[in-house]
């Protein structure tokens, strides 16, 4: 997460977007991948650590709802998803991952060309912050 490069805008040295292209298409795809990765990470830890299942289920559902708003969960490489082996470290690890996702969603909301997308991403960041409070 967090490695966006600013593409040249129309008239700034690069080919401009076609008149029908949505300028936020690439951003939405990147955000959807980040949310899907977070969802998979939470799900892997929920399955590996049954005593935490109830606590992690609401976070997993939040990511699924957020992904649905953007078109649905996408596949993420299984090699990038691993459950924390020690149960006592799960919540701290997920807390750090969720913090990074929250910060990225805030940055993405600023990058969005569409006001509606900016508002949606900011709302998602707030939702993640609320869930993090319970980790």
For the regions a protein language model found, what residue spans apply to each?
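All-alpha RGS (Regulator of G-protein Signaling) helical domain and cognate RGS-like helical scaffolds
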Residues: 1-135
